[in-house]
């Protein structure tokens, strides 16, 4: 059965697809298409171009390289990131018709870093998905932030936070919700 992205979004929006399955089903229309992203970490200055899915399987070495650029830079701790975050970003780019650099504000956060940030801001969740490697704060270079947020919401693939004053969007692979 072929699904277009639009068909998938309709199904996801109507609740016929369980939210936790949505990221893995999101690419059923084009399962054999390679997926590549270009990243820059705004805190470390590192850049990375990665083809993390070769059209058949996720490429473990490339996912490890992405985990490294998404590390907790404050403590230099690397944690395995949820690969479906990258699928979400790839879908967002596809929806928007862009191939923009993914500028990372925050990927993995150690519990110690999360606690330190939480002590300074009430906007940091106590049980943040960042501590599980299931969240990323980012923007797409040169792309209107509201468009990125709207595309992420349309996916219905997890949480979406919009932070226009700080110039980033948060996405995670938890339950579908937005703020």
Predicted regions and their residues:
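Active-site acidic/histidine clusters and adjacent loop/turn architecture
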Residues: 55-105
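Cysteine-centered nucleophilic/redox motifs
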Residues: 88-93, 110-113, 138
